[in-house]
Amino acid sequence: YEAPDGARSPGLFTARVYHPTWWHSAENARDKDGGLGFIDKGPLYDSLGRGNPDCLLNDWHAYDIWKDKEQHTWKNTPDLRRADINWFDRHEFIYNNPASSQYGKPFDPQNLPHPAEHFIRIYPIPFYKTYVPNHPQQTSPPMGSNGDWYIFRLAETFLLRAEAYFWKGNTLAAAEDINKVRGRAKAPLITASDVNIDFIFDERARELFGEEPRQNELNRVSYIMAKLGLNGYS
């Protein structure tokens, strides 16, 4: 936000791009009486921002990839990348409209026009990656505000090298590189027998949310597998 006036923007737009439209009256904001349970002001709005997601987060990323061979789940994993303090989960969405009869109560999917679609309407957010508070002088809607963003970093380098080791058949070296990333996050360490291309890409999802062009990476590895005739790719 220290940029000159003419060079400033509302910021990173991470809250806009990744957060759900929890505040929107047409679909997500209704209370049990059909009125507004959520509003775009006050508590929640100052931190969750004005989401309008271009990238909807799914339950696979929020829940499934945090399971491990030690029987941890997203609820009890020691992995800091899924620590409760770092995420904003579904049960933490609290109706913030003082005029609502459900003010202060948790979001209820049954209030939606289509309750079965709740998983795409209100979903967990890796808040530690997407939230940057507005500058005190910033008057634009909270959309992620101004902050630094990764271009590249060591964790991705380790995971790229781990993948290279995997293609060469050296799963021991691959596990060592993956464990450098997992150890930093306090996640349970793995062994060479755990290493396959699926695990490597799950680890990329756990570590590199918002940092990698994931579709491009999946396409890249699909071409490699097709070239090698692996797993039905041709």
Regions found by a protein language model. Give the residues of each.
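Aromatic-residue-lined binding/catalytic grooves and analogous aromatic/hydrophobic interfacial grooves
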Residues: 1-48, 165, 170-186, 190-193, ...
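Elongated scaffold/linker segments in the mid-to-C-terminal portions of large proteins
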Residues: 1-153, 233-234
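Residue-level signal for the start and early helices of compact helical domains
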Residues: 73, 141-143, 148, 191, ...
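Extended, hydrophobic/aromatic-rich amphipathic alpha-helical segments that build helical scaffolds
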Residues: 79-84, 148-183, 197-207
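Residues that form or immediately flank small-molecule/cofactor binding pockets and catalytic motifs
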Residues: 87, 205, 223
